């Protein structure tokens, strides 16, 4: 998966580290970060110690229908083509929807329009939930700032800040992969709902 994977830079080094010691679900990775007390930044309003998801596309893909069935990225994003009697993988990496006859329809027998509609409907459902979560997170950060401004103590805010960290992390993890609304629709909706 190379760069389509969740990673972070260890503080004080230029080396990538992969937070999968606890497993490869969003909860496992969060637990890893919490265990090592890792923080990417402190939120300006809420003061929550935040995590920033990088590119968890492959990690999420592995929890989706195609990943669990052993497909690779190249199966859909670099479909086979033939030129001059030679069959090879197309290195013009693109959306599988651009060449449905060489991607989706290799396995699925539905029409191109039906398959395209299926993808767009999955994306629509995830985006609907994502939009609601974004609004709630924004309100929560503003409410935390209000509490700080009214004199809340670190001890009083501890649980709230952890909830903000967790909620923002899960939202970010779900949306930072870009293609997860199709690659792992059910997993992304589960993450956004948690």
Task: Give names to the regions the model predicted.
Residues 1-75, 79-193:
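Primarily the internal scaffold of c-type cytochrome electron-transfer domains
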